[in-house]
């Protein structure tokens, strides 16, 4: 389907038919941090794992969250007065695109997913009026952690069926790494690389 990319350009994206976003708006769309975070978690829940026995890292992204967001822009905020100029000048306006961001990866590598979850809970208590914002963040982090745990489970299952001892050992190591980084910050170079793979896959999936 055609969607607006994070750069505001119309692109074609595959969809996961198992994903059923929950709307919080009469248009059938969903808007706001809480609904967006919870629906992104639903996408992660449906997203397949990817494990190759000969790779030292697992996890990829296969779809874009934008394919779940229809409409992409809240129709309560009308911009029809801009349509004429947009058409005249062939403007790719980007309205409805989620845009890109530049995260401080050191925070994630230092805290790990468990530490990020703790930080969200801490700041929720300090900012009661922003409950919906923290609901969305918690849903995303919980969804990513579950996605990582599914990789650990699948890697162990593949390892049990693997006859080659080297590949089996690699798969078991991969599973152990995933089990650990789902809750703890990475300790080794390989664990840090695996943490970054999951973060980048989730970030790319989002926008």
Language-model segments: which ranges?
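Long, non-catalytic protein-protein interaction scaffolds
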Residues: 1-126
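Structured, charged N-terminal subsegments at the starts of enzyme catalytic cores
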Residues: 117-207
